[in-house]
Every structure is written in C-alpha cells, then in structure tokens.
Amino acid sequence: METSMARRAQTSLTALAALALLWAEPALALYPKKGDSDPHAGVRDARRRAIQGIDVSRWQGEIDWEKVKDAGTRFAFIKATEGGDHLDPMFRRNWAAAKKAGVARGAYHFVWWCRAAKDQVRWFKRNIPRDADALPPVLDVEWNGHSEACGKKIPREKALAKIREMLKGLEEHTGKKPIIYTDITFHEDVLEGEFNNYPYWLRSTAAPLAHRYQRKQWEFWQFTTTGRVPGITGDVDRNAFFGSESEFAAWRDGRYDIGARKWLRGEPKVAMPKPPTTPAGLRAPKAAGATPLRYVPPGKIPRSARAEVETTGSIVRD
C-alpha cells in the first residue's frame, strides 16, 4: 500500500512538473523532443519562441537531417568557410542533406582578422553555391583569441572597414542582405551602434539579451551551446527567431527586411475593428453610477468633452 501510494505521488509530481515546464515554455508542447544538457533559467524567453533552429559544423559529425526536421527545427546555419583557405569538411554534405529534409539553411563564414577581406570574400564565393532557396549568408565576427597565429585584436575602425567590405561581397554573391553573428565582447568593442539596418544574430547563453547588449533589436538569439536535438549526437547550439510565422515566411520570400523591420512588398492589410453595436431591443450598458456609454468615431469628440479626455483620459459620456 505504501509503495503504491508513493508511486502515485511520484507520478503526480512528475505530471505537475511537466505541466509547469510546458506552461513556462509552450514551444516544448509542439516539439517536446528538443532539450538541453545544461539549461539556464536566464534564457527561458528564447526557448518559448515558436521558430527554433540550430547551427552546426564538423563538430556535430554525421547528422540525420530528417530527424532534425521532425523534431521541429525550422532553420539551420551551417558553417562553410573560415578565413581565406579553410572549408568545413562537413559543409557540402550538410548543405545538401538539410535542403533535402526541408530545413531552411544558410551558410556562415568565420572571419579571420589577419586575412584580407577581399581574400575571404573570394574564398566564400568559390565554395558557396548561389541558391535562391537558401537563407541569407552569415558573417561570423568574433575576436580570434583562440588562435596563436591570428589572436591579436585589431583597431576598431580597421575591423569595421573589413566587415563593410565582406558584407558587401557576400551580398553581391548571394543577392541577399547578410546576417551579422557576434558575441558580447566583440559587439561591445566594435559593433555598438553600427550596421543597424542589418539583421543581428546574438549570443547570450546565461541571461536575456537585454542584460548583455545595449542593442534594443535582435533577429536571432543563440541561447545555448548545450542543446539536444534528435538526429544529432551530443550537444548542439540552439537558436530562436525573434518574430512570428508570417514574419519568418515573408523574410524567407524576400518580402520583409527583418533588420530594418520594413516590408519590401506584399505588406499585409490590417482591417480596423468596427465599433461595437447594441442589438435592437437592448439598451447600451451603463458604467457603474454613470450615464450610458456612447461610441464616438475618431475626430468627432464634442469640443466640450475633448479637453476632459485630453486631461483625464475619460471616455466620452452622454
């Protein structure tokens, strides 16, 4: 009896915990297979976002992209090139397999600050095919502190000049405005206040982006490096898109500029709601202790009442 009661109690606790998790992160209700080997409470908002994605490189090894797609992965940024002479050995395989599985994918280039911008653009163009169905390219800008040969920081203005040249080159090659990926340190050192019309993909794995960046706007959020997704062995970076299904679809179709938050074409028509009507035979409701409320179209507020509305915010009454 005690064992049975304990088992029922444990089952109830497990169910309550699951319900609490789904309430906090509704996206998990749609894609419960996604996870994190070391989740952080500071990025809960990213896990709530409806449109989830990943970024991958050779470190993820062989990927079963069909399983990745079935787990609800909507997009993937795939490492392509680095510097002026390195191609990720898994790029071509990932590029083809992700498309076949129906995962929207884009290629990213990792910048080396000791290589000329023109050499890096040339290398990217040589290895990344033009594909009208692909997501815009990504320019990954971080300091190369891990490199013995290229670890020194360069002056801010020199870094900005290189970035400008590479953004231009990537856009000329693909016909799409590139995305800028960066981390907290590089953004603070170089990017603060720059390239505001470009989409930004920002990294923050332990706190909301607003706690780490002065930038008020973001388009993609890399919120964990310890994500778990079916089809991938071990940890993988997980990312969230800022907007809605319609914004994601319009961005993919080239109708919406997410960096500038501007419709390029096909802006949806939003119908203005009609004022409420009172059915025949019924009287309009009264506010407590007051006269009946009356709908007044915009611009038709009586002059005598307008001053009161402007100073008190009161609704117009008969």
Describe each model-derived feature in a short phrase.
Residues 24-26:
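N-terminal signal peptide c-region/cleavage motif recognized by signal peptidases
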Residues 31-53, 195-309, 316:
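Functionally critical loop-and-helix segments that line ligand-binding/catalytic clefts
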Residues 2-13:
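Bacterial N-terminal signal peptides that target proteins for export
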Residues 136-214:
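Catalytic domains of cell-wall/extracellular-matrix polysaccharide-remodeling enzymes
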Residues 17-22:
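Hydrophobic core
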Residues 74, 104, 177:
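Residue-level detector of anion-binding/catalytic polar loops
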Residues 40-63, 78-164, 171-173:
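Substrate-binding cleft of extracellular glycoside hydrolase catalytic domains
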